[in-house]
């Protein structure tokens, strides 16, 4: 009996023990997770930077998806420019940087596509393999191009009033004995100084809206109040041009926003409408609720905007009619500020215009959530 028991125990051990060992190995593997090799491959495959490893025969032995997306690796063959850089690396052992932007792009910064590559040996002791790191710098290139344009535009725009003030000051000195001439030149200097101050103020406001400075906390803002304040800011200018500003009836609408910024945005739209309207015409402002947003529309009966210019009117310093804008003291920044105010309020600005008929700019801002209206809706649903 004891012999049979021993034999049975051995048989069970031979059958069960391997299963237990295998189960423990599986548990250990699960607890350990992926191997280091698997982890590294996963990291490179998810990297926002393209990575490719090439040998001395121009055979790509490894590449991640990003390298293919950026068109540096095609059918396991490296881009010619990257391969030429790799050959220099194989010969010298020194790192090489290379421009891998699409060849058809004449100006990468303006087109929005800019790709840079850096090639280096995989290891210093083995010159059989080189690694190509591919960096999509398109966003940086676009920002740099925008910065250059902005600096150029600011320099040009500031030069005009500063130059005018310099000329007027010289004329003022030369006319010291003529009071009427002195007064005329002095009035022009004051106008140019005001224009310069307005431009600097709007540049500061635009930089604040675009920059990292924290915006004020958004709160409930009465739409009727901001419309009334915006109109009052430009009533004198409208009266001087015999332009009538009409508004629809008060609505009681409220939006989620910053009152000062919203007044600035509406005031800029009103100012723009007055500047581009003939004397004796009307500018109208209307309000309506659409979905979860409140829309404020400013309509003029002015010169209108050509289709090709409608996409550009929100660019900094862009003017549809430069002569008219300078005559009215415009800075070319008003609509750019409106665009950024809308974006910072999770809203939008859209334009309808027809040359010779006029234009309508519509600012759309999320409505302020009214707890009472929501509770009423819930009560109605319960009653149903």
Swiss-Prot record:
Claim: Iron is one of the keywords in the record: no
PROSITE patterns in the record: HIS_KIN
Cellular localization per UniProt: Cell membrane
SUPFAM superfamilies: ATPase domain of HSP90 chaperone/DNA topoisomerase II/histidine kinase, Homodimeric domain of signal transducing histidine kinase
Effect of a null allele: Deletion mutant does not exhibit detectable PhoA activity, even under growth conditions where Pi is the limiting nutrient. SenX3-regX3 deletion mutant is more sensitive to phosphate limitation, showing a reduced ability to grow at lower phosphate concentrations. The M.tuberculosis operon can functionally complement the growth phenotype in M.smegmatis under phosphate-replete conditions, but not under low phosphate conditions.
Record's keyword terms, sorted: ATP-binding, Cell membrane, Kinase, Membrane, Nucleotide-binding, Phosphoprotein, Stress response, Transferase, Two-component regulatory system
Residue segments, region Disordered: 360-384
Enzyme Commission number: 2.7.13.3
Modified residues (Phosphohistidine): 156
Gene Ontology CC annotations of this record: plasma membrane
SMART domains named among the record's database cross-references: HATPase_c, HisKA
Induction note: By phosphate-limiting growth conditions.
Top-tier EC class: transferase
Biased amino acid composition, Basic and acidic residues: 371-384
Gene Ontology terms for molecular function: ATP binding; phosphoprotein phosphatase activity; phosphorelay sensor kinase activity
Membrane topology: Peripheral membrane protein
Stretches assigned to the Histidine kinase domain: 153-369
Protein name as it appears in the record: Sensor-like histidine kinase SenX3
Native organism: Mycolicibacterium smegmatis (strain ATCC 700084 / mc(2)155)
